Structure formats: C-alpha cells, structure tokens
Amino acid sequence: MALSASLHLRQSQSLVMTPQLMQSIQLLQMTHLELGQFIAQEVEKNPLLEFQSADEAGFGSDRPERDETGLTAEAGGAEESVDHGDLYDSATTSPGERLSTELDADFANVFQDDTAPQRADAPELLGQWKSMPGAGGSNDGEGYDLDDFVAGRKTLRETLIEQVAFAFAAPADRLIAQHLIDQLDEAGYLHAEIAETAARLGASAADVTRVLLVLQQFDPPGVFARTLSECLAIQLRLRNRLDPAMEALVANLELLARRDFASLKKICGVDEEDLIEMLAEIRKLDPKPGTSFETSVTEAIIPDVVVRSAPDGGWLVELNPDALPRVLVNHDYFAEISRHSQKNSAEQAFLSECMQNANWLTRSLDQRARTILKVASEIVRQQDAFLVHGVDHLRPLNLRIVADAIKMHESTVSRVTSNKYILTPRGLFELKYFFTVSIGSAENGDAHSAESVRHRIRTMISQESADAVLSDDDIVDILKRAGVDIARRTVAKYREAMNIPSSVQRRREKRALAKAAGF
C-alpha cells in the first residue's frame, strides 16, 4: 500500500494554559507578602502601573459610613451578600473615561488616578489587632518611640563581646573568644570542635580549651555548652551545686526523659527524697540560655480576612485592606504618551502591551480578592458553632465540601487556604486549621472533628491528678460515653502527636512533683 500525504481540517476543543491564566493561579496562592513583592516588580517593569497609598485610596479611619464598593460578605445564615462592584475600579467619572473614546481604549477594571475607592470601616477586631505591639500595617509613624528603639535589648553576641573585653587581655585570647562566639547558635550552644578551631586559628588546643573554660563562666549561665548535660552542669557549677550525685544525674538525662526514677536513684546513690529535691533544682535551670536575647525582628502575622459579629447575630466577613495591595493604572499618562507616538510604532506597541498587562493584573487581583472572600465566608458559615462555643464544636470539614458549596474546584480552595490567615473573635487562625478529618459518632449522631477530639484529650489529661491518671483505654471509654466512636490506637496516636507521655510516665512524674511540692 502506497503512502501519501494529505491535508485535513478538524475542529477540536482543548484546554490551553495561557501565561495570563498561569499568572492568575500563582497570584491566588501567594501570601500578601509575596503578592506585594510581585506587584512591586510589575510596577517597576510597567510604566502605567502605580502604587496607591492608603490616603489616596480613602482608607481613613474616620469615615462614618460603610462604603458599598468594599468587599464584604455576611455569613450567618443562608443568605450571603457580596457587592460585585469591581474592587480595582472607580465608581465616579474621571478625565480618563473621557479619553477612552478618543484613544479607542478600554479603561474598565482599572483604578482612576483622581478618584478614591472607599472601604468599609475597619472592624473592631482589626483595630484591636493594629493596637497590638509589633503589629504591622501602619505607616504613619504614630506610636513609634525612638528612645525605645535605641534602647532595644542587646543580642547574645553583643552581650558576650562586651564581657570578652574585661575577661581577656591578650589579643590572641580575644581572637579565639570572638571566633567561638561566632560559632554559637541562637540557644547559646557551641557547635565547634576544639581541634578544628585550633587548626583554623593556628593556636594550640590547650589555649582554645583554656579560653572556652573562661567563656563558660560568662552570662547568661550555661552559654558555650556543647550538650544539654554540659549546659546544666555549667549552671550547677556556678551555683556551687555540682556534687557527685548531681553530676551523675545530669550525665544520665536519657533516664530522666524516660521517667526511670528507680535507675536514677541507684546511679546517683540517693534516696527518693533526695532525688525529688535534685529534680526540683534541675527544673529551675535554663536549657536554652541564649533564647532570652533578641535575635531577629519578629514579624506580626497580618490576617487576610477579618470576621466580626453582625447586628443580626450572624457574622460579617471582610477582607483586610492592609493585606490587599492597591495599584492603579495611570491612563492619563498612557493617553499623553499615545498622542505623541506614531501609530504602528514600537512605542505604541509597547504601550498597548503595558496597558493590556495592567488590565489583566487588576482583574486578576480583583478575582483573587473575591475568591478569598467567598472561600472564607463559606468556612465561617460551616464553622459557626466553633465561633460561638469554641474548639469543642469544630465541625469536620474538607476541601470538597467547601468547593461544592461555592461551585469551585478543590484545587482552587486549596490554593486560597494556603498560608492565609483569618482573624476571628476566637483568635487568629490559618484557614487550613478549619479542615480536619471526621471521627464517627458512637450513637449515629453528627461526626466529630479530629481537632476537637484532640482538644478533649488534652483537656482531660491536663485535669487529671496523680492518684487518677487516665490510661488510653480510660480516655476511650470517656469519649465513647460522650458520643465519640474512637479506637484506643487513635487515642495513642493523638497523644503522641501532642508530645504527651504515657499514663505510666505521667503517674511517675505527677507523684514526684506532688512530693516535691511538699518540701
């Protein structure tokens, strides 16, 4: 059979991932910090994009009325009210709109540079969050105390360097000391070998050891230790309490971790009363002496969504404007440049591309904001009992339930809830916190969330006494009487995940603590 070439026409549909669609997906899963960095890069590349400050956007805190163009959803019942006005659009007429006819350009879905989109009054919870120490979102400088900043706490390295100047006179010793200080971690532990340090500095191992012994007497006590046992031993030595029994105790911390008090009494050569006193003294020591110093600036978590009570008893879900980057398209500049550029020129093509990219970016940002609000509103509606009564009433929830309710794909819900935070009357939570697996009911009732069951287990164990320590089987019986159908191995798995020891270890520890409290 002869082979021949032919040309055929065929119509078909296929899904194509365009660069714009990929950008929208990436924007959806970005945190507000990543989004701010991305927009800063776009503003730098696109001459038609500009940042809009809070003052220009009309975000004054003294506005008495709620603006109807703000994104707000009411999640308290079946009715949900969301204003579908474009978040990145203006509601009033501007000179740019009059220019659109002249230039044959579409200026929809972009900010007008001479109008100010309004926002809803900041809810009480957002105001409380802003008043917290270290909270971000304010650029006006109010509440900033220069004296407090200048008199800030010293770092661990600065504290140790000051002591080196008084402890060592020889330049060689100071060089060794400064090198060892640079090898400390944030907890104050030394991660350097004596021989390696000596070879690197061209000093003898004896000199490095001598300097290290002096450094181990610095404040805070316990610094420059290489192990936890050495850290505790240094602190006990400075307190003049490192006797042979205590030295044996800190050398066998693994037995203490296993609550093997019988072996500890035998190794230390003490009776039960002496061991209890030694354990009480060990508890007063600091296992991480360096963590009490400032290491870096702690950034406050800025919530993406804020929830507050509605007057009708429901919940108002609002986007946090401090987490929304505000950008506008300078179409007046676009019109001015277009007048002076030739048609079909490279400049005109570049400007048209910039305008197209700017329009797409503003639409993507608007869609991102609305998607976050829609997902958060559905989560609040599903977890209404949690907001009212607490974690014991947290419902089991998964991505599919939320996706089906808002007519979106599960992957979209997953991207929205990734690294996004919501401020509620119960505190600040990651959106992922509300998604927990389901645990069946013992009486064919409503299922229970795994997080609420873990909370019950933690509460029961925290309230037990030394004479009534609950075993895993006891916890299973209590939960089944409360309507939770759970297996003993599941209780053990949850307990271990929360770093709670077994009932035998808890009983030993509680009895030892009870006896120590009597002294």
Curated annotation (Swiss-Prot):
An example molecular function term from Gene Ontology annotations: DNA-binding transcription activator activity
Q: List the disulfide bonds.
A: none
May I have one GO cellular component term? Answer: DNA-directed RNA polymerase complex
Indicate whether DNA-binding appears among the record's keywords: yes
**PROSITE patterns from the UniProt entry:** SIGMA54_1, SIGMA54_2, SIGMA54_3
- Segments carrying the region annotation (Disordered) are 74-96
| DNA-binding region extent | 396-415
Among Pfam families, the record links this protein to: Sigma54_AID, Sigma54_CBD, Sigma54_DBD
Domain of life per record: Bacteria
| Short motif (RPON box): ranges | 487-495
- Tell me, which GO biological process terms does this entry list? DNA-templated transcription initiation
Task: Supply the alphabetized keyword list.
Answer: DNA-binding, DNA-directed RNA polymerase, Nucleotidyltransferase, Sigma factor, Transcription, Transcription regulation, Transferase
Q: Which InterPro entries match?
A: RNA_pol_sigma_54, RNA_pol_sigma_54_core-bd, RNA_pol_sigma_54_DNA-bd, RpoN_core-bd_sf
Q: Which PANTHER family match?
A: RNA POLYMERASE SIGMA-54 FACTOR (PTHR32248:SF4)
Tell me, what does this protein do in biology? Sigma factors are initiation factors that promote the attachment of RNA polymerase to specific initiation sites and are then released. This sigma factor is responsible for the expression of the nitrogen fixation genes (nif operon), glnA and dctA for dicarboxylate transport. The open complex (sigma-54 and core RNA polymerase) serves as the receptor for receipt of the melting signal from the remotely bound activator proteins NifA, NtrC, or DctD for the expression of the regulated proteins.
Q: Which family does it belong to?
A: Belongs to the sigma-54 factor family.
Q: What is this protein called?
A: RNA polymerase sigma-54 factor
State which gene encodes it: rpoN
